[in-house]
C-alpha cells in the first residue's frame, strides 16, 4: 500500500473500502440512487443494475430512489449511506458511529444490515462505537483510550 500513488490509493479506497459515517455524508443534490452509486460513477464504471436493485430491496429503499436526502428520515439516510458503502462489494467496511444519531429501532435495523453484509458477503466490518450493546454484538472488541489500546477481547471465535 505504501508504494501506491495517490491515484492508486483513491481507486483502492473506492473499490475495497466502504465507509459509513455518523452524519451520513450524503450529497444533498443527488437522489438516493445517485448517492448509492456514487463510488461506481467516480470510478468511471457502469452501474450493476442487479446489484443496485438488490441493495435497494435489502435496505428497504424501494420506491425512494428519486428522493433527495432532505426528503428522508435519519434512518433512511443512514440506509442510503450503507448502500453507498456496500455498492462496490468492498472487502472492508468501516463504520464510524453508524447508529449515533438514530433511535433504538433504527439502530437495531442498521446494525442488522451491517452484520448481514459481514456474514453473507464475508466483508470485514470495523465499527467505532460508544454504545456498549452494539460493541457486544461484535466478534472482537478493541478498547482505545487516549490513542492507546487498553484491551483486546474476543467475544466469539
Residue ranges with predicted function:
Residues 141-153:
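H-loop (His-switch) and adjacent beta-strand-loop-beta switch element
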Residues 1-144:
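ABC family nucleotide-binding domain
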Residues 156-157:
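ABC ATPase nucleotide-binding domains
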Amino acid at each position: 500500500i505504501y508504494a501506491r500513488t495517490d491515484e492508486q490509493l483513491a481507486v483502492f479506497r473506492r473499490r475495497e473500502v466502504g465507509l459509513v459515517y455518523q452524519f451520513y455524508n450524503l450529497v444533498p443534490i443527488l437522489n438516493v440512487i445517485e448517492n448509492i452509486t456514487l463510488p461506481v460513477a467516480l470510478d468511471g464504471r457502469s452501474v450493476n443494475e442487479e446489484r443496485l436493485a438488490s441493495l435497494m430491496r435489502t435496505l428497504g429503499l424501494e420506491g425512494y430512489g428519486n428522493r433527495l436526502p432532505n426528503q428522508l428520515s435519519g434512518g433512511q439516510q443512514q440506509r442510503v449511506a450503507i448502500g453507498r458503502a456496500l455498492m462496490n462489494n468492498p472487502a472492508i467496511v468501516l463504520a464510524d458511529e453508524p447508529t449515533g444519531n438514530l433511535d433504538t429501532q433504527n439502530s437495531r435495523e442498521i446494525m442488522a444490515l451491517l452484520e448481514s453484509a459481514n456474514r453473507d458477503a464475508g466483508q470485514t466490518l470495523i465499527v467505532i462505537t460508544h454504545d456498549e450493546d452494539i460493541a457486544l454484538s461484535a466478534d472482537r472488541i478493541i478498547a482505545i483510550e487516549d490513542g492507546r489500546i487498553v484491551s483486546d477481547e474476543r467475544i466469539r471465535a
